[in-house]
Amino acid sequence: FAQRHSDMKQYALIAPNSVNILSNKLPAFAPVQDQNSWLNNLSDSLTQAGVTFIDVRDTFKDHKMEDLYYHTDHHWTTQGAYYAYLQAAKAMEIDTSADTYDKAPVTRSFQGTLSAKSGFRSGEKDEIDVFLPTGENVLASVINYVDEQKKSASFYDTDKLDTRDKYALFFGGNHAQVKISTPTETDNTLLVLKDSYANSFVPFLAQHYRKIVMVDPRYYYGDLEQLIQVEYVQ
């Protein structure tokens, strides 16, 4: 893929999980895989292929005293996603100097899959926050859920806060294809091949791209090459 589209700027951001960043909190002698060697090898391979590897590990370790991950779930928190966005912005040459946000808690009763599957800390609940951009120049986005043929003016499906899967607040969960349109001054399109970690990450990018096309390879069965041509991804 990288070779076929060498004319496109390409980036890869792999979310390290909490075991990697918060290894000091693991029980003594807990068996874990060495994520760092795997990520380092992946970084080398992608770099050789012309893909810019966005490494957030050092940034996360600098902020590991903050809640970067949910206590009951495997995902990063919105705070963690924000730090990942700042690191990505440096690599992607995005100017974040004017970015300001209001951090708003939307629930304090989230219980994620780690707790649900293991039964550990079954009484503990997490807080989910959203970062709302502020200022006079905030642009409104339109979110198009392609397969569902549904549009929304918000990244957040608050109805999901009344369900067991409260993390689905972000975009209502995972979808094969989502298109985000924002009337930015620059006419640029970003294609994001993603998993669920991106759901709380991509909203930070919306103010900087005229169009963002999110594709989840786990559910998308269309022709990606054709999609790139149709959407004028550069």
Predicted segments with their positions:
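Extracellular glycan-modifying ectodomains
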Residues: 1-234
